[in-house]
Amino acid sequence: MKIVGAEGQEHEEFDIPFKLWRKFAAKRRLRYQSWEEGKEVMLNKLDKDLLTDFKAFAARFSSRPRPSKIFGTSSSEAISGEGNGQSGRGAARNHPRARTRCGATSTNHGGRVVPVAVAAASPRAPKKAAEAASRVRGRRRLVTRCAGAAHTQPAAIDLDGGFGHCVQKEKEAPLSQARAPAIPRGDRGQRGRKRRCGATNGGFQQPTGANQARQGR
């Protein structure tokens, strides 16, 4: 762009975008006229100090980090011409400030995602879950009775503390209430057959001819 005085005698040419001049003029509240889409600007009074300040302002503005809409700053990249023609997204992604210590960037910087350390699932996790479920079910007290005991009182088993031993408390019962030991289910038929075969000999079958030999004696 070119800046000229009101009289048209003095002029200065700058390799600075016109948008940056508009920001500088708004900050200084300068009155000017422009034409040819900002390629030429005319001031009422062309001051050397004003031009020096404008150059310093352009240098400071150009040295700022490449902004984008993600950073929430102004579009100085398009104004200053930085970024080698890259868009705001590409400039923000390649900017050093957008990178984290781990080498990646978050979703707020250029759309990249920071890798989050996720704890690996333990192979013992299903087993622990099953144990927890068994403890919940074990809180219901289970009543058992051991077969073969004369008279036992059912004991409550509490599995909250883990797998323990079954402890049964025996109490003395009157003789009239005493019962015979429980017979396993599979031996009931066998005992009946033994009685029928040899009821006179204590329930055991004698060899063939044993009774005849005893009577002969």
UniProtKB/Swiss-Prot annotation:
Might play a role in viral replication since it is associated with viral replication centers. Seems to have an effect on DBP localization. The keyword Lipid metabolism does not apply. This is U exon protein. Keywords: Host nucleus, Late protein. Belongs to the adenoviridae U exon protein family. Residues 68-110, 170-217 are annotated as: Disordered. Its main location: host cell. Induction: Expressed abundantly in the late phase of the viral replicative cycle. Residues 202-217 have a biased composition (Polar residues). It is found in: Host nucleus, Host nucleoplasm; Host nucleus, Host nucleolus. The lineage of its organism: Viruses, Varidnaviria, Bamfordvirae, Preplasmiviricota, Tectiliviricetes. GO terms for cellular component: host cell nucleolus; host cell nucleoplasm. The keyword Endoplasmic reticulum does not apply.
